């Protein structure tokens, strides 16, 4: 069963562009990871939201321990208002299967 993750990242205002650049540099490598079905960065005025979908909990676990995130850590050091808020979700299917879940 797929696993959905929503991560909220709040960059310090003076580092916003650098944080976005770090993510855009990392995203292609994550897209190539086994089990990555979606890894999409979104933004509003003060925060970034990463919406992820993984083929399984094992795929998510491998991602969280993988080289792409390990390499990204130093690029984000000192540039965030605090740790990312990461929420791991299971779908509650409802209505049309194509529209009722990620």
Regions found by a protein language model. Give the residues of each.
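Glycine-rich beta-strand-turn "strand-cap" elements at beta-sheet edges
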Residues: 2, 40-46, 74-102
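Short, well-ordered beta-strand segments in beta-rich or mixed alpha/beta enzyme
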Residues: 3-9, 40-64, 102
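Short, surface-exposed ligand-recognition loops at beta-strand->loop->(often short) alpha-helix junctions
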Residues: 9-19
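Non-catalytic surface loops within mature trypsin-like serine protease
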Residues: 11-13, 56, 90
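Intrinsically disordered, low-complexity acidic/polar segments
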Residues: 16-18, 59, 95
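An amphipathic, aromatic/His-enriched active-site/gating alpha helix that lines ligand/cofactor pockets
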Residues: 25-37, 53-87
